[in-house]
Amino acid sequence: MNKGELVHAVTDKAKEQLGESITKKEVDAVISAAIDCIMEVVAEGEKVTLVGFGSFEARERKEREGRNPKTGDKMLIPATKVPAFSAGKMFKDKVAPEKK
């Protein structure tokens, strides 16, 4: 699913839940604003938690040894921060329901 398909799906869900009209343009603006806010907060080193869905945060990736793909020479890859997502319980259960 790409962003356009997500906007379409969210528009349909929102119309169901709100019982009133909402445009794809409005939904696109809200989704874009939410994504921008999440990226800004995580870039500042803070964690964003959406209960049930999951959390976004920046994690430290340690310095490690790697190889130059062109020459095969060993090289040191410096430590860096990377964005990370951890799925919440409700999300995990939706993807892989527990069998009882």
Swiss-Prot record:
InterPro entries: Hist_DNA-bd, Histone-like_DNA-bd_CS, IHF-like_DNA-bd_dom_sf
GO biological process, one term: chromosome condensation
GO CC term, one of those recorded: cytosol
Keywords on record: DNA condensation, DNA-binding
Highest taxon listed in the record's lineage: Bacteria
Bilayer-crossing regions: none
PANTHER family for the chain: DNA-BINDING PROTEIN HU, DNA-BINDING PROTEIN HU-BETA
UniProt family annotation: Belongs to the bacterial histone-like protein family.
Name the UniProt record assigns to this protein: DNA-binding protein HU
Source organism per UniProt: Synechocystis sp. (strain ATCC 27184 / PCC 6803 / Kazusa)
